[in-house]
């Protein structure tokens, strides 16, 4: 049984019997499960030994791959064969070296580029498949510099961590 803090998403409207789970805080696993909880596929993730204790976002992509964050700074796309097919290290890329950054949310655009919410730094960065910056949007000042969840709805809708700061 996969218990703990989880992100649970149906894989698609057509496959509503399958569920993608990101279980953390001691479980440190991604899984595809039947609706009854039977695990069909499982991938162990970094966990606390690499400073990571929570999956706040996970996406099942049209390609059949999974987009998730393996540490607080590394966003990865893996195949169901568990091969890393894309990754972006926010701690080292695009001017972030030496800065405090943590990633809680991200999304893939139809063209294959990716939006990553870089909390601490306080920006939404849009990178291409090679990791080059396409666009940067500031999260604003104060408590808005940290997010937990972001969704693209024609704009960016973000859940702030410390709204009253």
Task: Describe the role of every protein-language-model region.
Residues 1-10:
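Bacterial N-terminal signal peptides
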Residues 14-165:
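Secretory-pathway ectodomains
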């Amino acid at each position: 049984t996969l218990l703990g803090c989880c992100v649970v998403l149906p894989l698609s409207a057509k496959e509503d019997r399958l569920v993608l789970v990101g279980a953390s805080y001691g479980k440190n696993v991604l899984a595809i499960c039947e609706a009854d909880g039977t695990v069909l596929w499982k991938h162990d993730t970094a966990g606390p030994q690499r400073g990571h204790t929570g999956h706040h976002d996970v996406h099942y992509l049209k390609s059949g791959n999974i987009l998730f964050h393996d540490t607080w700074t590394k966003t990865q796309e893996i195949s169901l064969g568990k091969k890393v097919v894309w990754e972006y290290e926010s701690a080292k890329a695009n001017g972030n070296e030496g800065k405090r950054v943590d990633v809680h949310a991200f999304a893939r655009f139809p063209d294959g580029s990716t939006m990553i919410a870089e909390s601490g730094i306080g920006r939404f960065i849009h990178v291409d498949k090679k990791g080059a910056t396409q666009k940067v949007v500031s999260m604003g000042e104060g408590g808005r510099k940290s997010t937990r969840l972001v969704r693209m709805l024609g704009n960016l809708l973000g859940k702030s961590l410390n709204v009253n700061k």
